[in-house]
């Protein structure tokens, strides 16, 4: 997330479990509730991740409230990680906007976000493929470019 021009890294947590009721429960603490529902629909339609019968809880750790499209991909990855009960790669930062067609779109200031991740010791960065052409290559962090949510879910 960018606060003015300063990057602030946030932890996105998700819990996905089978619903015991006819209508699944969905909550979002610190993230836009409607955006989370939209991202779940994109996962269902574009990546074949069937969440329609599952309860889903999304939380931004530390009580922060974040409303930036760049965290879309992080929410998607957290949801899939919980749904599949598989952890993401350790020391990984994720950013990218997700569109309705399942495409992963560029976000502003990718180089600043990556520089901050390197300073904090992250080893991997999953980001929009289109951002890679504007990034200075470095051996301090492994850059993984993706172009769709279908590509993203293959990483978990």
State where each predicted segment sits.
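Peripheral, non-AAA+ core regions of ATP-driven protein-machinery
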Residues: 1-156
